[in-house]
């Protein structure tokens, strides 16, 4: 499953404005020793117990999405997905959302786990230039990170793109989605 939330960080406020979506953070959930654990990119790529992950979001709101064709996720495929995620464990967070593999951001990690482990591409990449940076937080983040060298053609996959994927179905939602400020 893929968990989505809105984090209270300044970056997440900017991502919400740029993507017009309240879903600004995501991770892949695996069951480890009978407990749900979220594999996420937040500092280093790491495993976070579900209860801790929920606390990092706004008002405990979480949406759980699942692959519509769940039968594709056989035990062997899930093992391959975990192996794909393991390769990124400990890597630093990518504040520039660059399409390399040295640093990882949250939605990139999710997409990589599904693509490398299951051969399934969830979410569509878009160009930075196609996002809306007119909001105050989004504009500030863009200027702080890139200065005058805005990479308009740089591909990026956002939590919003993953959330909208036609390959996924919502299976649970807890709490209310926050309102995004534009």
What do the PLM-derived regions correspond to, one by one?
Residues 1-182:
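Cysteine-nucleophile amide-bond enzymes
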């Amino acid at each position: 499953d893929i968990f989505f939330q809105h984090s209270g960080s300044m970056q997440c406020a900017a991502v919400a404005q740029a993507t017009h979506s309240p879903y600004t953070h995501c991770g892949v959930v695996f069951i480890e020793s009978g407990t749900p654990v979220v594999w996420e990119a937040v500092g280093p790529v790491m495993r976070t117990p579900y209860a801790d992950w929920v606390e990092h979001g706004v008002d405990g709101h979480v949406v759980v999405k699942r692959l519509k064709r769940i039968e594709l996720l056989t035990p062997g495929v899930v093992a391959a997905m975990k192996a794909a995620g393991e390769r990124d464990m400990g890597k630093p967070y990518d504040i520039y959302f660059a399409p390399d593999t040295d640093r990882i951001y949250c939605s990139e990690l999710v997409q990589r786990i599904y693509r490398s482990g299951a051969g399934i591409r969830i979410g569509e990449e878009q160009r930075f230039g196609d996002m809306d940076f007119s909001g105050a937080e989004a504009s500030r983040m863009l200027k702080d990170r890139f200065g005058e060298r805005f990479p308009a053609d740089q591909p990026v996959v956002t939590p919003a793109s993953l959330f909208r994927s036609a390959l996924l179905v919502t299976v649970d939602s807890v709490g209310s989605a926050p309102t995004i400020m534009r």
